[in-house]
Amino acid sequence: MKRALLSVSDKRGLIDFAKGLIKNNYEIISTGGTLKFLTEAGVKAKAVEEITGFPEILNGRVKTLHPKIHAALLAKRENSEHMKTLEEHQITPIDLLAVNLYPFKETIEKKDVSYDQAIENIDIGGPSMLRSAAKNARDVIVVVDPDDYDSILKAIANDDLSHDFRRHLQAKTFRHTAAYDALIADYLSKEEYPEKLTVTYDKDFDLRYGENPNQTAAVYADAIPKAYSILQAKILHGKKLSYNNIKDADAALRTIADFQDQPTVVTLKHMNPAGIGQAITIEKAWDKAFYADDISIFGGIVVLNREVDLATAQKMHTIFLEIIIAPGFSEEAYQILAKKKNLRLLTVAMTNTLPKELELTSVLGGAVVQEMDRLVENAADFEVVSSAKPTDEQLEALVFAQKAVKHVKSNAILIAAQGQTLGIGAGQPNRIDSVKIAFKHAEAKKNFDQAVLASDAFFPMDDSVEFAAEHGIKAIVEPGGSIKDKDSIAMADKLGVVLVFSHNRHFRH
């Protein structure tokens, strides 16, 4: 008869699994709550204490940390010395170990959880047994996932416990314990950039392909859910998102997070805003975002920060969109939008601010890590450096434009008026070209006479200020900081335009 040790916090499928093991000539030993759960269901099982001859102590902190458990897991069956040692100490080998760990993640997700509560949910015995069993996976079947129970029972029944199958379970176990420890380390870490960066993500699903069809890809979600995360979105209608959909939707959600004070709509293509509109109603905000660029929006993504109503849905229904994201949809809005088979409708929880977390970007051989750009632009932080002073309306427009340009790929120039982007110049190697592209889109707009201009970084020369002023711009905001700032200020004064320094750069690569 073989022996299996079962000690789990997640009891899904456990009864059927234990019964299947008994049917295949396994003796069951167990601990604490798992033992009680099994015996109450009529499954015959022995307590670990019967095996070790030692009781649980320290309120359950020490249950399985015993040589009769770990030797039973670690002994190599083909090693005669190992087996002789087991016999001398009257230790029966353990052939299968099923363990899942104390719910540390679920504990720290609870509101107002204390440090002591979190610490008490750090499993010690479980990871120790798993590591012992996984090290000896050639002889011990190691199980961390209830979803594997059926395949394991089938393999046992068919005597098909191949090397590859055991290796698969072994690797899965070490990933499981590594992720568990990474989560604990992250919770306890106070250093922003510790000497070891431990991160853990859970696989969500495989993608058909990555950025291009020749690239494989999959989606992994943060172990702890975050606000504004596209990976926490609920798909109400349509198929799963693609790699590019996810990247674009993430960029759109990051953008709209800066505009929670009023109803706002962001349209986006290829991780750049196509249009941003802000108004007193979500319908009017849609109108502004749509007319900001009614060409680029085709096949794009739309994110709204208020519930989608019928009037807004009727307007969106007339054009081809890939994805619409909002906190919610009225029943009437949903019914009209869901008529389009290939349109995805998603809901995402939106709070006042983005979560504070580090951003990781892979480079060959490693990663660069930085704090997320969560800076909130405020007119109180602006410095007027020109002789001309902004009106209240201009100042409001400058704040809006500076918030928006933060989300455009560098070199970034954005022209805006009255809560609406009019023209966006993105991703050019030199700033003056971005200026010209922005003007190409903006000049024909009916409210261009009210337009202001924002730049994500300083002007290295005065040519951008000169071009903007000569083409009708009356107010400009930029970070400042160039060795030639004086030239830009002089040009602004010469041409009578307002120049404001925000002192905050927003490069986006």
From Swiss-Prot:
Family annotation (SMART domains): AICARFT_IMPCHas (SM00798), MGS (SM00851)
A molecular function (GO) term: IMP cyclohydrolase activity
Domain MGS-like, chain residue ranges per copy: 1-144
UniProt keyword list: Hydrolase, Multifunctional enzyme, Purine biosynthesis, Transferase
UniProt key word Hydrolase: yes
Pfam family, one: AICARFT_IMPCHas
Catalyzed reaction equations: (6R)-10-formyltetrahydrofolate + 5-amino-1-(5-phospho-beta-D-ribosyl)imidazole-4-carboxamide = 5-formamido-1-(5-phospho-D-ribosyl)imidazole-4-carboxamide + (6S)-5,6,7,8-tetrahydrofolate; IMP + H2O = 5-formamido-1-(5-phospho-D-ribosyl)imidazole-4-carboxamide
The enzyme's E.C. designation: 2.1.2.3, 3.5.4.10
Ranges in coiled-coil conformation: none
Xref: InterPro entries: AICAR_Tfase_dup_dom_sf, Cytidine_deaminase-like, MGS-like_dom, MGS-like_dom_sf, PurH-like
Gene Ontology CC terms, in alphabetical order: cytosol
Biological processes annotated in GO: 'de novo' IMP biosynthetic process
Pathway membership: Purine metabolism; IMP biosynthesis via de novo pathway; 5-formamido-1-(5-phospho-D-ribosyl)imidazole-4-carboxamide from 5-amino-1-(5-phospho-D-ribosyl)imidazole-4-carboxamide (10-formyl THF route): step 1/1; Purine metabolism; IMP biosynthesis via de novo pathway; IMP from 5-formamido-1-(5-phospho-D-ribosyl)imidazole-4-carboxamide: step 1/1
Record PROSITE patterns: MGS
PANTHER family reported in the protein's UniProt record: BIFUNCTIONAL PURINE BIOSYNTHESIS PROTEIN ATIC (PTHR11692:SF0), BIFUNCTIONAL PURINE BIOSYNTHESIS PROTEIN PURH (PTHR11692)
UniProt free text on domains: The IMP cyclohydrolase activity resides in the N-terminal region.
Similarity comment: Belongs to the PurH family.
Name used for this protein in its record: Bifunctional purine biosynthesis protein PurH
Organism: Oenococcus oeni (strain ATCC BAA-331 / PSU-1)
